[in-house]
């Protein structure tokens, strides 16, 4: 039961519409799968623009079902924000990052996403799951929460250890939220690749 504690907001499932309607919170969350878009739910959402929908799916094509939910809301004229919930069972951080980025990236670049909610049923710390979510949001230009780095992979023209240089630059600048820093191995392609960076680090070139 939501007690009105500062910094917290109530969440409901689609079977709790009467309770949600009586709640006086300025912001409410509604967990809703695609199949729950009944006439009753649609009518409720039309009178409650403060509700943020959390789209859930267990369908084999989860991304397709998330898309279908948003398009159905749009066809009803609803403008409630939509957050996509994705459930994973990963033990390796890189596996989670790749799968979550592929899933959420498709929805973000469709322009359908207001937020993402990642849940991992495994041994990975919550901090890694949260960092993955924030990284995806930043890559999709939805929310900036940290310094952004642009780097080339390095090639035969790179005359220094690119990986260790990136690590040193990150250590010195990771607190500069919102800054975009380009780190390039040479002057040949570097300036073009980091054209939209705020600052750049470019190595020497072997011609």
Indicate residue ranges for each PLM-predicted region.
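Catalytic alpha/beta core domains of metabolic enzymes, predominantly
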Residues: 2-183
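Nucleotide-binding motor/catalytic cores of P-loop/tubulin-like NTPases across gene-expression machines
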Residues: 187-193, 197-207
